[in-house]
Regions:
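Catalytic cores of histone-lysine modification enzymes
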Residues: 1-92
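C-terminal SET catalytic tail plus cysteine-rich post-SET Zn-binding segment of SAM-dependent SET-domain
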Residues: 85-164
Length: 164
């Protein structure tokens, strides 16, 4: 195994390199139950409602292809513990019908493994980011939406300032 699971400064627990990991290495498979898109949507909504009610209900659903997703909310899926970063050192890739977490760069022993969760803007306020990256915008949103988010936040701050 190339990794250890331990406490993370980003969020709860995380995955850390046990040894130096070369660029483009298959680090860990993201495993879980293969489910239809309809079931995926149902579970996603259910878990988001749980999260709003009691702070739990994390969603670990990954898109596999146009017909199926993987629900990684199973105890044996250690990849679900990989935290988000706005400057990730890994990314998920579908390879031969499996989801793999692949290193984007050389990762040194002890470094936390991260990837960009790629959330849309729709519910950004529900997903604050604590990655600490210089590129961090304060919320977990996909890279191509960060410019728009910065504009939204700037407009919001202006409105708040006028209220005072």
């Amino acid at each position: 195994m190339m990794y250890d699971i331990r406490e993370s400064g980003i969020h709860n627990r995380g995955m850390f390199a046990r040894e130096r990991i070369k660029k483009n290495s298959l680090v860990v498979e993201y495993i879980g139950e293969k489910i239809s898109k309809k079931e995926s949507e149902r579970r996603g909504i259910e878990r988001m409602e749980e999260a709003r009610r009691d702070g739990g209900g994390a969603v670990y659903i990954f898109e596999l292809n146009k017909r199926f997703d993987i629900d990684g909310n199973v105890p044996e899926n250690e990849a679900r513990l990989i935290n988000h970063s706005c400057s990730p050192n890994c990314e998920p890739r579908v390879i031969n019908g499996q989801i793999w977490i692949v290193s984007l760069e050389v990762i040194e022993t002890g470094d936390e493994l991260t990837y960009d969760y790629g959330y849309d803007l729709e519910h950004f306020l529900e997903h604050p980011c604590r990655c600490g990256s210089k590129k961090c915008v304060g919320y977990i949103v996909r890279t191509d939406k960060r410019g728009k988010l910065k504009r939204i936040l700037k407009q919001h701050r202006k409105r708040e300032k006028k209220k005072r």
